Amino acid sequence: MEGKNTSITFDGREIRLTTGLYAPQANGAVMIECGDTSLLVTATKTNKKEAADFLPLICDYEEKLYAAGRIPGGFMRREGRPPERATLIARLIDRPMRPLFPIWMRDEIQIVASCLSLDERVPADVLAVTGASLATLLGEIPFYGPMAAVRVGLLGDDFILNPSYREIEKGDLDIIVAGSPEGIVMIEAGANQLSEQDTIEAIDFGYEAVTELIKAQENLLKDLGIKQVKPSEPEVDNTLAAYLEKNCTKPIDLVLKKFDQSKEERDLELEKIKLEVHSKIDSLKDDNQLKVLTSENEKLIHSDFKKLTKKLMRSQIINDGKRVDGRDLDEVRKISAKAGILPKRVHGSAVFQRGLTQVLSTTTLGTPSDAQEMDDLNPSTEKTYLHHYNFPPYSVGETRPMRTPGRREIGHGALAERAIIPVLPGKETFPYVLRVVSEVLSSNGSTSMGSVCGSTLSLLDAGVPLKAPVSGTAMGLIKEGKEVRILTDIQGIEDFLGDMDFKVAGTEKGITALQMDMKITGLPVSIISDAIKKARPARLHILEKMQDAIDKPQESLSPHAPRLLSFRIDPELIGTVIGPGGRTIKGITERTNTKIDIEDGGIVTIASHDGAAAEEAQKIIEGLTRKVHEGEIFSGVVTRIIPIGAFVEILPGKEGMVHISQLSEARVERVEDVVRQGDEVTVRVREIDSRGRINLTLRGVAQNGGMSYPEPTPTPVAPLN
């Protein structure tokens, strides 16, 4: 087999593009590789036309564990439902691809990116996005491409292009920038409270690299003799559009200018206008062109009515600087926030409301054993902070079956999770596993940013010592030719009929997360820069309102939350604490009714609903790991008797033996003649043998004094109530 290939090198890493070798029945297929990471990306289009007013595009990302040389767990030893990571990468492909297809296109299109080999130094997600563009172009599918994506990291003061997993973890920025020849079409970012200016510079840096990957795709197409299919809109009968414009422009415009009406009232009035038009058309004669046209396509009235509403709303913003609810372009909706709204059976709770968007967030404190184990190709093996986002149908006044979380819910949850992670306390300071659940009670735009705000409030209510509170807002855009208007805190209709949804989250210090999606074919960095800068005063305004509700962590945890103690032991003594077959640690947990977790680095975490029990377990473990020296004197308790001597517990969990010859200066016939089980005695450490066994003596030791058990100072990481 022979194929065509090209390559481009970034910071010493070569990206290779090869076509013509695999998946010959797909419209387009490309192998994209960097290091040992290899992906096969295919694009397939059917001629089936969907009777819908949207593009039926499906983007899938598949990763099999063989790509990392692993066999799946479970009885079947086969991959099952796609992991969350695969869902997020599938969304990452979809988001920059969708706006680059013609808005009139209704053919079914499916893009499948399959990770065949994974190099832990080279993340596969940005390669999948670039591969999706090239596969679509190779398949000669109408598309406003090429499009490409790169990742930018920040180590110290230096930007890094397509950093490794380790560099991402060590750095202060992880941003993915996707763009077309027209400009940027998608941004996804997490940052460690990065300034707006540094963030903008990173985006600009990333887009420069995107243009190089776009050129590489164009060169490969040229070498193959493939001409890009420029989308050309089919002829459309505009009879209905003209009729609606003539008969509906004035009534729709009046509705959009009723700034004091509610969303429900506006929706009802617009629906009434649409039904009246529908009724008028239905009353026409059967051979009337309008009636024939709408009877052949029942959704045409809805589609053209939406287009007219969109046109009028956008015109009002461009020309009058007013939005449908009467706000100025940079004005935030009314905000209310309250923490601690649920009983303390729920460890932390809060409700955040902005306009008609209302989110209830709850926080649960868990033990280290509650961490989520990751069974995918991500180098991270577990998650200790989880954010789950739920969007029930009643939040938008609808009815539908409630199923498992969909792609949108997973994506919104991941964004809110990413926004909070940079401000979470360290494991040694606060070793709890944290789960936040955000329930959207009402939705009218920017529920993901409402979830960020609700998460902050509920975490503080749970007593989590955040480094700083985080707030978020969604920025919008209306672009008509050269006229551009940036909107602050967009609501549902502005998201639906606008050109951009740009979510910005962060602290007073800087940005922690970004997510930008477009409905047009690209924007210059200058406009994106303006949006980021205008988001800051909105974020700080929201933050001020949140701090009126709760401005610091609760001083005490819920009485129903587990109590944790965390301390460090010598990693070489972990085996001593665990004991043969786990008997020692099992005995401690049963004796104290606690849960104990020990990490490879020697960090011990003890969990219990009883603070005294946790302290007792800590005392035992510290006794087990305390080094005993020859000559030390201890006051201990005789734990058992054997024919040749007695065992004495000199520290919690640590015993030594007094040989029968060391019980007294005189000869002893029977051990029981001197000591019995339960007696308290004072002993001296005579020697520690080569196997670490402690030999004790009573000879020459006064029995009315000596050292008592040491009382180590507990190291609680949360207040013990």
Swiss-Prot record:
It comes from the Bacteria. GO terms for molecular function: 3'-5'-RNA exonuclease activity; magnesium ion binding; polyribonucleotide nucleotidyltransferase activity; RNA binding. It catalyses: RNA(n+1) + phosphate = RNA(n) + a ribonucleoside 5'-diphosphate. Residues 631-699 form the S1 motif domain. Mg(2+) binds at residues 495, 501. Its EC number is 2.7.7.8. Keywords: Cytoplasm, Magnesium, Metal-binding, Nucleotidyltransferase, RNA-binding, Transferase. The keyword Methyltransferase does not apply. It is found in: Cytoplasm. Its cofactor is Mg(2+). GO terms for cellular component: cytosol. The keyword RNA-binding applies. Residues 562-621 form the KH domain. GO terms for biological process: mRNA catabolic process; RNA processing. Disulfide bonds: none annotated. Involved in mRNA degradation. Catalyzes the phosphorolysis of single-stranded polyribonucleotides processively in the 3'- to 5'-direction. Belongs to the polyribonucleotide nucleotidyltransferase family. This is Polyribonucleotide nucleotidyltransferase. It comes from Prochlorococcus marinus (strain MIT 9515). The gene is pnp.
